[in-house]
A protein has these predicted regions:
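Bacterial N-terminal signal peptides that target proteins for export
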Residues: 2-11
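Sec-dependent signal peptide cleavage junction
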Residues: 19-31
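Aromatic- and acidic-residue-enriched carbohydrate-binding clefts of CAZyme catalytic domains
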Residues: 34-39, 78-129, 143-179, 212
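Hydrophobic faces of well-ordered beta-strands that scaffold small-molecule active sites
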Residues: 41-45, 70-74, 133-137, 204-206, ...
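Active-site mouth loops of central-metabolism enzymes
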Residues: 42-56, 170-180, 364-367
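Catalytic domains of carbohydrate-active enzymes, especially glycoside hydrolases
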Residues: 56-80
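Flexible, acidic glycine-rich loops studded with aromatic residues
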Residues: 63, 254-257, 268-371
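Active-site neighborhood of glycoside hydrolase catalytic domains
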Residues: 172-259, 265-271, 276, 282-289
Length: 371
């Protein structure tokens, strides 16, 4: 194994069971009509920072298939890697790629990716298990891997969408004020809308977290960017999902209300007591869960304190694992969005679900064992 530590996908099953239990308990607390549809329950899986082969992703689907209204959100791109085939940036199986060890490898970047055939097979498999598979393409930030590929394979287009030289976020943020940048992202989405079609529900997550370093009072250019992509996805038969942390209070009235918000943190971090500039700006300018609900949005609870997990040496320590589970069960429910503040929204009527999120920052050289 080359001294790599191994974790099994089945280790997440216990966490999933606890999440589903907590959501079911919240049904009573929320005083919902029993005839209403139960909240969606799912997993968001980061396959960019930590790549998972298709056979492993199927095991997550198997785990989720035990629960009604379940979904698996694939975080397919981030700064570290574009984990799927993408002709728009020149990452394809028929050019600059080799198939080895059961996966495709980009010979330009030396990074693995799922082919479109892999993705279509996963969608078909998820559909057979009554699990909805949701694509997420991170934009307009967290795009370093995509920009690196574009710079190599289409330098003219790279120049058209990048931020001006000297901009601190040029390495991972496109200039979303430009029509060319919006068209570029739309083209990437268009590669995958046909592949994820034909499911019981059609969702597409467009990212939109951590745009620029600090939240701002208002951002009309971001509103235009998001609404344009939402309108495009609607015409393709999809409901748009996006992260919450750059939705400004001042802009609530002008965002399309059919966008569903996956809410992780108002302050853009995990420490509810943080007083740094980003947290302070978030409290001042970013809409809270309650404000989003009051404005007419539907929310999914992705609370970054309780439902975020980072597989790796620290997480799999028995005492850490036990504390995480016990804390989740004792202190979280569907109404609690803002980290471990204990603050609850007044009603969960438009809280349509929740997810555990598995991020790859700490996975390091951990390998994944197939069951």
């Amino acid at each position: 194994m080359n001294n790599r530590k191994v974790f099994s996908v089945c280790a997440v099953v216990g966490i999933v069971v606890f999440l589903m239990t907590m959501i079911n308990q919240t049904e009573v607390k929320a005083e919902k009509n029993l005839t209403q549809i139960l909240p969606e329950k799912g997993i968001a899986l980061d396959i960019s920072r930590k790549f998972y082969k298709a056979e492993v992703i199927k095991q997550f689907i198997d785990d989720l298939s035990n629960y009604p209204n379940s979904f698996l959100q694939l975080h397919m791109s981030d700064n570290q890697n574009l984990a799927v085939e993408m002709a728009t940036v020149g990452q394809t199986t028929d050019k600059n790629a080799v198939y080895q060890d059961g996966q495709w490898l980009n010979t330009q970047t030396k990074r693995p990716f799922l082919s479109k055939n892999d993705v279509m097979d996963l969608v078909s498999y998820a559909r057979s298990k009554n699990v909805v598979l949701i694509p997420e393409i991170e934009a307009p930030a967290h795009m370093q891997a995509i920009l690196e590929l574009l710079k190599i394979n289409d330098p003219k287009r790279y120049e058209a969408i990048k931020l001006p030289d000297g901009a601190p976020e040029q390495f991972n943020l496109i200039d979303y004020t430009k029509v060319e940048a919006i068209d570029f992202v739309q083209e990437m989405l268009a590669e995958y809308t046909p592949l994820f079609a034909g499911q019981a529900k059609a969702y597409f997550h467009i990212g939109v977290d951590e745009i620029d370093w600090l939240p701002v009072e208002s951002n009309s250019n971001l509103v235009n960017y998001v609404n344009t992509l939402d309108n495009f996805l609607k015409h393709q038969g999809y409901t748009t999902r996006m992260w919450n942390d750059r939705v400004a209070k001042a802009d609530l009235a002008v965002y399309n209300k059919d966008i569903q918000i996956t809410y992780w943190s108002q302050i853009g971090g995990w420490d509810i007591n943080s007083t740094d500039e980003r947290a302070s700006s978030g409290r001042q300018y970013t809409a809270s869960a309650q404000e989003l609900l009051d404005a007419g949005f539907q929310l999914l609870n992705y609370n970054a304190y309780y439902t975020y997990f980072l597989p790796g040496q620290r997480m799999w320590q028995p005492e850490s694992y036990a504390y995480t589970i016990n804390d989740l069960v004792a202190n979280w429910d569907l109404s609690k969005f803002e980290l471990n503040s204990g603050k609850q929204v007044s009603s969960t009527e438009n809280v349509i679900g929740s997810a555990l999120t598995f991020w790859g920052e700490e996975a390091g050289n951990y390998a994944v064992k197939s069951n």
